[in-house]
Amino acid sequence: MQKELLEVFDNRFPDRDYTIEIVNPEFTSVCPITGLPDFGTITIRYIPDKVCVELKSLKYYYLEFRNAGIFYENVTNTILDHLVDLLKPRTLTVTTAWKARGGITETVTVSYSAGQDE
């Protein structure tokens, strides 16, 4: 996944804590074992510091996963790592909720907080 696709814009309210929530209910990737498509909802919640993620660039970044063979846990952690590196937010949480496969669903959540050991 090319994190270079992600763009930012300046946060006009860097002295205020506020939460941004971004939801993509149409995320797709590919199971690395079966080669079958995986469908999920990606939710990003963060408190920005100096910059915010630009949504069109995030959309194109997500498309990079469409044909990638990658496990749910790797999707979730990769998105978190790339966004933390880019945004340097105060806090950031990524939750991926995957559609049922064989009657089983999975939700993966990973969080970052500025100042925590990485």
From Swiss-Prot:
It comes from the Bacteria. GO terms for biological process: queuosine biosynthetic process; tRNA modification. The keyword Repeat does not apply. Its EC number is 1.7.1.13. InterPro entries: GTP-CH-I_C/QueF, NADPH_dep_7-cyano-7-deazaG_red, QueF, QueF_type1. The active site is at 31 (thioimide intermediate), 38 (proton donor). Keywords: Cytoplasm, NADP, Oxidoreductase, Queuosine biosynthesis. GO terms for molecular function: preQ1 synthase activity. It catalyses: 7-aminomethyl-7-carbaguanine + 2 NADP(+) = 7-cyano-7-deazaguanine + 2 NADPH + 3 H(+). The keyword Oxidoreductase applies. One of its GO terms (cellular component) is cytoplasm. Substrate binds at residues 53-55, 72-73. It is found in: Cytoplasm. Pathway: tRNA modification; tRNA-queuosine biosynthesis. It is an enzyme of class 1 (oxidoreductase). Gene3D superfamilies: 3.30.1130.10. Pfam families: QueF (PF14489). Belongs to the GTP cyclohydrolase I family. QueF type 1 subfamily. Catalyzes the NADPH-dependent reduction of 7-cyano-7-deazaguanine (preQ0) to 7-aminomethyl-7-deazaguanine (preQ1). This is NADPH-dependent 7-cyano-7-deazaguanine reductase. It comes from Chlorobium phaeobacteroides (strain BS1).
